[in-house]
From Swiss-Prot:
Keyword presence, Phosphoprotein: yes
Protein name: Hybrid signal transduction protein dokA
Effect of disrupting the coding gene: Elevated levels of cAMP.
Gene3D superfamilies: 1.10.287.130, 3.40.50.2300, Histidine kinase-like ATPase, C-terminal domain, PAS domain
Bias (Acidic residues) ranges: 168-179
């Protein structure tokens, strides 16, 4: 057999693996290591360690011991090399053995030949660089020798130079002797035959050439290939029928495979399911597979990679591993018996036979044969071995603090240069220890004899297997690849158990496990159990079979050790911490100069509240080297220098039986003498004590071997994770941060050296808040975490999570961590919305509840044998296996798989295929966009509708150009983040509206909702609904509504303008002297016009409400005047029909007189309801009642009820009346007419005010009438008479503050007035009583004449005499009452203003119904103050001004005008004009001339004198400026002003009004808002600008539009809606014009020139530009 040829290529060391073979793994940081092994390494190892024992069982025991000692020395040399390799993780390690006849490889292909040529060139360059580096090392060693020969004067404790040189010469001689013994040992082992000839190899013992690149910072890409290696390793026997179909699809899914995907993904153990499809014609096999989340997370690879790796089948020879050219990082493979698990990282899954277990068994078998000799021989051998160990220990103890070793292993020579400093004081201690160990060894040999006898049978089997493999070179019966195991299990339908090696190329970790392969009809399932990370938890080989069994039982699922999340379970970390203490020894005798150069600036300990370090042994070694430079020279370990870099132990450990596999037994025997060794030499690099925050008594403790790990080691393990790692010192100052995967964000690297650099990644507005939170968290000294916004250079904001972990020094005595033990901080920062960093993606806890339900559904299917799950365990037939009730253990899932086979019938397969086909059709033809994506933004699949929505093609999707995170605009980041948080918490999210960025750049509005896919923690399905068409339709509808509203507004203005003229002129005619026929005709014209205006207003109001332009204008207002306006508007129609219009307020509870709300909206609702009630009632009554329910504070609920005795509404038509334009069909609709908008408008308006409206109707045929009522909540406002100190809600409890006229009814010392009410209608009586009770009057009612006369007669004989009689003129006994009264004052009411009783001398007042508060109270007050009938005024309806005029004419005997004001309403106060004012005179006189401004001049209008008449000096005129463009409206306003005693000056537009503003002493301005050239708004603005300071002329708006708010904005003072009524005009003028005693205006107004107004100047400039453009 040819000698083995091993070559490992890498640019970065992975980790030293403590093993008996003693060579080191190397590998690239991003891909797998390459390893090519030819020859039986296992056999060479067995020969090197055991062949001599087998051949010389009875004669050569001493020689065997010598060989073992030499082997141990050789191991020490190897450890030196490994120690140097740990100093730099970027070194290239090439281990080659002696050139021996290699295996003859097949001819390489062109591609392989090109790779070999490139490899050869690269090796030549490497050799040149290595030679230069060796020269540099030698120069450094010479310089260090000179420095030691000439120590500084401060080191007075050093021995003389001559003594030091002698010690160095002795050390060099010992090293040379050891090297010669090693060479002899190697030559001796290779002389056994042609197949065992090797030099520098040792069959895996690690003797090889180590070439390091010191200080090389550049990382090499790619993997080098030795040209001497064979291009293929498949030289063994293959299955004749096995051919992998490379052209077949990779993802061919069988029905049974698809059915179990979701189940496997939920299992808590790693499982790999393989589907096998065999072609019976050609024997080809098609493989499909699925790896669950546990396995893919453990190996950091996909299911496709695992399936592809199975297509390369290694040779059946256990001593051959396929070369790198023939296998692409095979993820799953078995391992040769002679190959350690950690030496073949090119395979992810690998069944193996442990070398060290096999070696121990074979040694025991050999020792069992040697039992025929006496125990004295064994003791002699042990003594010889111990003597040899004593020599080694002397060498080890001579080394003080630094050791620099450069080893170059070539074909035949090994050069070693060693600089040491000896110390003879330790030799005696070592000798004593060795003597003790001799006794211990004798005892151990006696104890092992019995155990070896028990294991003889097993040792014979293993030896027989090894002999066959070594001697014959043929394949043994055991399968050599995981695929062959799978195929054997599939064909033979049996379960196969195999030990495998799992390799994770991404984080460069390896795990040993047991694979159980179980067959089923369509393939196999591989279950991996007892997983252990061999890089982190590699243990000492068991010394006995029982130890090996115990160690196997201790192998638990170590997947959690792989977790890179900051909150890893500290129990695992503590286990790793203790494990490293018990099985590794650390030597502090490294070179101080080299250690100081690689000193890590950061130190942390593994404790319960510190971050778990996942570094490999090389990282630990590097950290240990850093410790030695900071600690003093008191070494606690006297082991050999060669093993110092790969060993670590607890400082307080006295265990002599536990050691690393890289250390000889002498390392363990000297642990008791740690305190006796002292340092006599301190290097210059460590002469100055560095500042340390650790206790001095623990500085030199070996506990730092596992506590010290540098930031770079942790970063190395996280090379592929997008986590930002930061560190801070003990003061909380951030000293470094870096993104571990080194992938830039927006082309900028995330790296920095201080906290200010880190703040650059935080948005500007949040930096102060983030800094405060970060600093406060550090002050607490505890683990912290919080969320913050992370800003990229392109201003994209993402939600990040930062976590910090304090690092304490723990002395091993259960001390509690506190701030004084704090030595630094270590933390991580990662994207919170992408899998929660590495926390979720790697830990990946199984959803046990989901797993239980899925298994239950599958195993309860009919027609086949199933395993049924119960809540208490697993039930199969009558057997019940108790399981954990919580259902959360991995053992339960294993029992489920092992209990029964999973079978699926053909009918179920067909059903599944049909469902899958249906799903594909729905997915493709769905009108909704559907996509499958991950939290990282990757879109896995999408249908055509989604691609059409965002504008991308399927090619873009397959090329990975679509990322849903990049499709989201920045303004939708926050709502997307909230949706993702909801999705993670509830596994589904509510629909949200956002936008996607189309490929063209436009924004596409969408409505999306998402849900998590069952069994997955990263993937979700999202449904996207395109809102573009609906948004366009919505905008079109809004625009159409706006145009319609604008059209209706313009049309209504044009229609209402002539209607206002008709109403105004009709009113003027009614005020003149007309015949009854003429008056009736004009009144009909006026009523028709009012109806037309009302209809136009309804259409306009509904249009505004539909468009959304109706807004509430809440203000304080008096409730009674508004109610009276509503009643007065319907009085004429009600009186014409002869129905009673009744008003009742506060029957049960008082109603506040002043409330806070929208007066106009409330009035419109009441007008519609009362108007409809009057319209649809022919006889009877219409009642308006106001009641209240006290809520709390100043909030009350007002209820308005309108009840009538009309035709009623059928029950099935009630809902229809609230629909726009909805009416009751039939003759009633044609009879009464109407637009059908009133009630719908009322409903919307009441809802806008926060109320609701209801309707109650009786039978239409019975005529029971209809009741409408609505309730709104309003606030109570304080009336004007209430002091500010009294709350508005308490006004009812302070009657003394009520208006004075309430008390004027009762004179000083007089008793309350007694009032007799004669009325048959109880509702009318109730209405009158409510008014009289508010005035403290005593009311008595009578419905018949006899009763009334009896009451009058009885009152005269008593003191309670009746003072006032209120009676209706409808009563038949009115005349009898008038004849009987003497001193009583009679007030009559009725519907006819020209009633005959109006001329009766005993009637003091006649009231036209409806009876309101203002009318009745005014009449009672007059009845008290006036003593005769001639002193009374007849109070009539305000709408019938003609009657009022006639009454005034008849009251010519009034000597002086009487004006009585009322706080409740100014309208109820009758104002008398002067006697010389003739309101009936329709001709213009000199006192009331009209001045019309036309073209800048002052001319008379129609029938107006052309010149201004001289103003009489006896009565100065009161001028009012009127700006109006309509001639009819001008005439109406001018005539009304004439009647009120004012002179009008008219301007036809705003510009003309400004020109004449200073020509007359104007006391008020009436402005129309819509005029040509300059409207009223612009004119008002200019007027306010040219006014002097402190002066304000009243400006009253006149317009048909409800633009009240805009009028006030431009400076107007009041508002008059058209048509302008005389009474309202009179009230407005009296409010704003202040007069003296003679009625003359008291204020005069002056104005600046128009040029003072900036608005006027801009207006003129604009007009000039328009004229120029027109020309």
């Amino acid at each position: 057999m040819s000698s083995p040829h091993i070559e490992l290529h890498s640019q970065r060391t992975l980790s030293p693996q403590p093993s008996s073979n003693n060579f080191e793994l190397t590998g690239n940081k991003s891909c797998a290591l390459s390893a090519s092994l030819n020859g039986s390494i296992d056999d060479l190892n067995n020969n090197n360690n055991n062949n001599n024992n087998n051949n010389n069982n009875n004669n050569n025991n001493n020689n065997n011991n010598n060989n073992n000692n030499n082997n141990n020395n050789n191991n020490n040399n190897n450890n030196n090399n490994n120690n140097d390799g740990d100093k730099n993780d970027k070194k290239l390690l090439i281990i080659t053995n002696a050139p021996t006849p290699p295996l003859t490889p097949p001819q390489p292909t062109k591609t392989q030949q090109t790779l070999l040529e490139l490899n050869q060139k690269f090796q030549e360059q490497q050799q040149q660089q290595q030679q230069q580096q060796q020269l540099q090392k030698q120069n450094k060693q010479q310089q260090s020798q000179k420095q030691q020969e000439e120590p500084p004067s401060s080191q007075q404790e050093e021995p003389p130079l001559s003594q030091q040189q002698q010690e160095q010469e002795q050390e060099q001689e010992q090293e040379q002797e050891q090297e010669e013994q090693s060479k002899q040992k190697i030559e001796g082992k290779g002389g056994g035959g042609e197949e065992e000839e090797c030099e520098g190899g040792g069959g895996g013992e690690g003797e090889g050439e180590e070439q390091f690149k010191e200080g090389d910072e550049e990382e090499h890409e790619g993997i080098e290939i030795d040209p001497n290696l064979p291009t293929t390793g498949y030289t063994g026997k293959r299955r004749s029928s096995l051919q992998i179909n490379e052209a077949s699809p990779k993802l061919i899914q069988t029905p049974s495979v698809d059915r179990t995907l979701c189940i496997l993904d939920s299992l808590p153990c790693p499982i790999f399911q393989i589907g096998i499809i065999e072609n019976t014609e050609n024997g080809n096999i098609t493989l499909t597979g699925f790896a669950n989340e546990r396995l893919t997370t453990l190996l950091s690879c996909s299911s496709n990679l695992l399936v592809d790796s199975l297509k390369s089948i290694p040779s059946p020879h256990y001593n051959t591993v396929p070369s790198l050219e023939s296998c692409n990082s095979i993820p799953i493979n078995n391992l040769a018996p002679g190959l350690l698990p950690n030496t073949d990282p090119t395979k992810i899954l690998d069944p193996y036979i442990s070398l060290y277990n096999k070696k121990q068994l074979k040694e025991r078998y050999s020792n069992n044969n040697n039992n025929t000799n006496t125990n004295n021989n064994n003791n002699n051998n042990n003594n010889n071995n111990n003597n040899n160990n004593n020599n080694n220990n002397n060498n080890n103890n001579d080394t003080t603090t630094t050791t620099t070793t450069t080893t170059t292993t070539t074909t035949t020579t090994t050069t070693t240069t060693t600089t040491t400093t000896t110390n003879e004081s330790d030799n005696n201690n070592n000798n004593n220890n060795n003597n003790n160990n001799n006794n211990n060894n004798n005892n151990n040999n006696n104890n092992n004899n019995e155990e070896i006898k028990q294991n003889t049978k097993e040792g014979e089997e293993i030896l027989h297997e090894s002999t066959n493999s070594t001697g014959t070179g043929n394949s043994i019966s055991r399968p050599n690849s995981i695929l062959q195991c799978i195929l054997d299990s599939f064909h033979e339908q049996k379960t196969i158990t195999e030990k495998v090696l799992l390799s994770n190329f991404l984080i460069r970790q390896q795990y040993k496990s047991r694979a159980t392969i179980k067959p089923f009809p369509d393939g196999c399932i591989c279950i991996f159990e007892y997983i252990e990370n061999i890089n982190l938890n590699y243990q000492q080989p068991p010394t006995s079979l029982n130890d090996r069994i115990n160690s196997t039982n201790k192998l638990t699922n170590e997947m959690e050790l792989l977790s890179l999340s900051p909150d890893s379970n500290h129990q695992h970390v503590q286990k790793l911490h203790n494990h490293n203490h018990n099985h590794h020894n650390h030597n502090h005798n490294n070179t101080t100069q080299r250690a100081s150069s690689t000193d890590s600036p950061f130190i942390h300990s593994v404790s319960a509240n510190s971050l778990s370090s996942m570094s490999s042994n090389s990282s630990v070694t590097s950290a240990c080297a850093s410790l030695s430079s900071n600690s003093s020279s008191n070494s606690n370990n006297n082991s050999n220098n060669a093993s110092s870099s790969n060993c670590s132990s607890n400082a307080n450990s006295n265990n002599t039986n536990s050691s690393s596999s890289n250390c000889c037994c002498c390392c363990n025997n000297n642990n008791n003498n740690n305190t006796s060794s002292t340092s006599s030499t301190i290097s210059s690099a460590s002469s100055t004590k560095s500042k340390s925050y650790l206790h001095q008594q623990h500085k030199n403790s070996k506990v730092y071997s596992t506590l010290l790990n540098s930031f770079e080691n942790l970063s190395f393990l996280l090379k592929s994770t997008p986590i930002i790692i930061w560190r801070a010192d003990h003061n909380g100052e951030m000293v470094f941060f870096k993104k571990s995967d080194e992938i830039p964000i927006d082309e900028k690297k995330v790296v920095g050296n201080n906290f200010q650099d880190f703040l650059q990644w935080v948005p500007q507005t949040y930096r102060t808040n983030f800094q405060e939170m970060f600093q406060n968290s550090l002050k607490c000294g505890k683990i912290f975490e919080f969320l913050f916004w992370f800003q990229t250079p392109q201003n994209y904001v993402q939600l990040f999570k930062i976590a910090g972990y304090p690092i304490f020094h723990i002395d091993g005595k259960d001390c509690i961590a506190s701030k004084r033990y704090l030595i630094g901080w270590l933390g991580v920062t990662y994207n919170y919305l992408i899998n929660d960093g590495a926390e979720i993606s790697i830990k990946g806890s199984a959803n046990l509840d989901s797993m239980y339900e899925k298994f239950k559904i599958i195993y309860e299917m009919p027609n086949i044998e199933r395993t049924k799950l119960t809540n208490n365990g697993i039930s199969s037939g009558g057997d019940i296996t108790n399981a954990n009730n919580n259902g959360g253990s991995s053992e339960s899932s294993n029992k489920i798989l092992e209990k029964k086979k999973h079978l699926i019938s053909e009918a179920e397969k067909e059903c599944f295929l049909k469902c899958k086909e249906t799903y594909n059709i729905l997915f493709k033809l769905s009108l909704l966009g559907v996509m499958f994506s991950t939290f990282k933004g990757i879109i896995l699949d999408a249908n055509d509708m989604l691609l059409q929505t965002i504008g991308y093609t399927r090619g873009d999707l397959e090329n990975g150009k679509i990322d849903w995170m990049l499709l989201t605009p920045p303004e939708h980041f926050e709502i997307s983040a909230r949706a993702l948080q909801e999705l993670k918490a509830k596994r589904w999210c509510q629909p949200i509206e956002k936008a996607y960025i189309h490929k063209s750049g436009k924004r596409v509005p969408v409505l999306i909702t998402s849900a998590m896919i069952d069994g997955s923690t990263e993937q979700c399905i999202t449904f996207v609904f395109d809102l573009s068409r609906y948004r366009q339709a919505e905008m079109a509808a809004i625009e159409a509504t706006r145009l319609k509203t604008q059209f209706i507004t313009n049309i209504s203005h044009e229609l209402r303008t002539p209607c206002h003229g008709i109403v105004g002129m009709s009113q003027l005619l009614l005020d003149s002297q007309l015949t009854n026929t003429q008056r009736d005709n004009i009144d009909s014209i006026k009523r028709s016009t009012d109806s037309l205006i009302s209809l136009i207003n309804d259409i306009l109001d509904f249009s505004k409400l539909e468009y959304g332009k109706v807004t509430l204008e809440n203000e304080s207002f008096e409730l009674l005047p508004m109610i009276e306006e509503v009643l007065d508007s319907q009085a004429t129609a009600a009186n014409r029909k002869g129905i009673d219009l009744i008003f009742v307020m506060g029957r049960d509870y008082p109603v506040p007189p002043v409330i806070f709300g929208d007066r106009n909206s409330l009035k419109k609702v009441l007008l519609n309801l009362v108007g409809n009630a009057v319209k649809f009632t022919e006889t009877g009554f219409v009642l308006l009642e106001i009641s209240t329910d006290y809520e709390s504070g100043d909030q009350i609920s007002l209820r308005f009820t309108v009840k009538d005795s009309g035709i009623g509404i059928p029950e099935n038509k009630i809902e229809q009346i609230f629909v726009p334009f909805g009416q009751i069909d039939g003759s009633f609709s044609r009879k009464y007419g109407g637009s059908g908008l009133g009630l719908s408008f009322c409903k919307e308006l009441v809802a806008l005010m926060g109320g609701y409206i209801r309707v109650e109707s009786g039978d239409q045929e019975g005529g029971k009438g209809t009741t409408f009522w609505f309730a709104i909540k309003v606030s109570i406002s304080s009336p004007s008479y209430l002091p500010n100190s009294v709350p508005a809600a308490n006004q009812f409890f302070y009657p003394e503050y009520r208006p004075s006229h309430y008390n004027n009814v009762i004179g000083n010392g007089d008793s309350p007035k007694n009032v007799l009410i004669i009325e048959s209608n109880q509702m009318v009586i109730m209405s009158i009583q409510s008014i009289l009770l508010s005035m403290k009057c005593e009311c008595i009612s009578a419905s018949k004449a006899i009763t009334a006369l009896d009451l009058l007669e009885s009152s005269k004989s008593t003191e309670n005499q009746i003072d006032i009689i209120v009676c209706s003129d409808k009563s038949t006994f009115v005349q009898q009452i008038l004849d009987y009264v003497t001193t009583e004052k009679v007030i009559l009411y009725g519907v006819d203003p020209n009633s005959k009783y109006n001329e009766n001398s005993k009637v003091y007042s006649y009231l036209v119904t409806p009876i309101t508060h203002s009318k009745l109270i005014s009449s009672i007050l007059l009845s008290k103050n006036l003593k005769s009938k001639n002193s009374f005024l007849t109070t009539t309806n305000n709408t019938n001004n003609t009657n009022n005029t006639n009454n005034i004419e008849n009251k010519s005997s009034i000597d002086s005008p009487l004006s009585i004001t009322s706080t409740s309403s100014s309208i109820i106060t009758p104002i008398l004009t002067s006697n010389n004012l003739d309101l009936n005179n329709n001709n213009n006189n000199n006192n009331n001339s009209i001045l019309v401004s036309n073209n800048g001049g002052v001319d008379g209008g129609n029938n107006v004198p052309s010149t201004l008449t001289t103003i009489q000096q006896s009565q100065p005129k009161k001028y009012i400026l009127v700006a109006e463009d309509n001639d009819i409206n001008i005439k109406v306003v001018v005539r009304q002003l004439e009647k009120l005693g004012y002179t009008a000056i008219v301007g036809i537009n705003g510009l003309k009004a400004l020109e004449i503003i200073g020509s007359f002493p104007i006391c008020l301005i009436l402005l129309d808002c819509q005029m040509p050239q300059m409207d009223g708004f612009t004119c008002s603005t200019i007027l306010r600008q040219i006014e002097p300071t402190g002066q304000r002329i009243p400006i009253i708006a006149m317009t048909a539009n409800d633009s009240k708010d805009r009028c006030f904005e431009v400076g107007m003072d009041d508002y008059l809606s058209k048509p302008v009524r005389v009474d309202r005009l009179q009230k407005t003028l009296s409010d704003w014009i202040k007069t003296d005693e003679n009625g003359n205006p008291t204020n005069s107004y002056n104005f600046y020139p128009l040029s003072y107004s900036l608005v006027y100047n801009n207006f003129i400039d604009t007009q000039l530009k328009k004229e120029k453009n027109d020309d």
